[in-house]
């Protein structure tokens, strides 16, 4: 995780912080792993005389609207297709600065311990936004759980 934090520090936080007269920057994050990574970055920046303010959000819409409205200097929670989709839907003009890491996608169950135990007709919850929904469907297809017709998944 320290390598991810260092990459983020070098590519996102320091350039923005250098332009801040008060040497502080406010970054919007979602809980895990983004907040945990920013806590490490905060300690690294403090050594160089910068203050990192971490604002935690529990949804994936507000960090972009807060950034567009100016209450954040940056945010750290999304992949590029999600950002591009949000820009189109909300008519925003946000740009990405750095690609940092790939989010894991997991299947969780209280009853099923192995993927092979998943029965035909089982229900699986997936994300409800276009880019992450498409990604989830692709991963389910890649693992042989569903079949998707060619050309149906074009958003991610």
Label each PLM-derived region with a short phrase.
Residues 39-50, 135-156:
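Ligand-binding cleft/hinge of the Venus flytrap
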Residues 21, 97-147:
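A conserved helix-loop-strand patch within extracytoplasmic ligand-binding domains
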Residues 21-32, 52-56, 123-124:
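Short, well-ordered beta-strand elements
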Residues 7-16:
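Bacterial N-terminal signal peptides
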Residues 54-65, 152-156:
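Short helix-initiation/N-cap motifs at beta->coil->alpha
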Residues 85-97, 111-112:
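Ligand-binding "clamshell"
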Residues 68-78, 122, 145:
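Alpha-to-beta junction loops
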Residues 1-5:
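Positively charged n-region of N-terminal signal peptides that target proteins for export
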